């Protein structure tokens, strides 16, 4: 992964590069951080920890094609390349369709296969190239019927402050994640395969 600060502005994208109906946002290079991943370039934000140190947030990173239409009950299909040159990963996206663990209301969207990454450093820019950081991947609870990995409920601050890279993952829930009908070609356990 190549990481660097971006110093020049790029045009706003009508859908955040997802082809999924997100709204356009102005690109502010002073507040956003650009990184390169296998699928293309993404930009996130720089924030401050309670101790005043900076950390970097990349939210709403799609890790599989939207599980809609023919992919609704299928195993996750990796994204080979993003649809735009620079993907906006500065905000959390929709969680997978399920029940809110607190209000019990139905929330989210079928298109919810996103992850969030919070890191105290950006590799070669902030640390020696041979420095590796511990990584914690968090899969939310909720009985496979509700919940999400958004930072509003599970704050990554303490772990990031201790030098840990934190990744939170949304996965398919309920019937969309765990329906099994072999005779209809639905293998089942898509929610576990998302993980």
Feature map (PLM): residue ranges:
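Non-catalytic accessory segments of hydrolases
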Residues: 2-5, 9-193
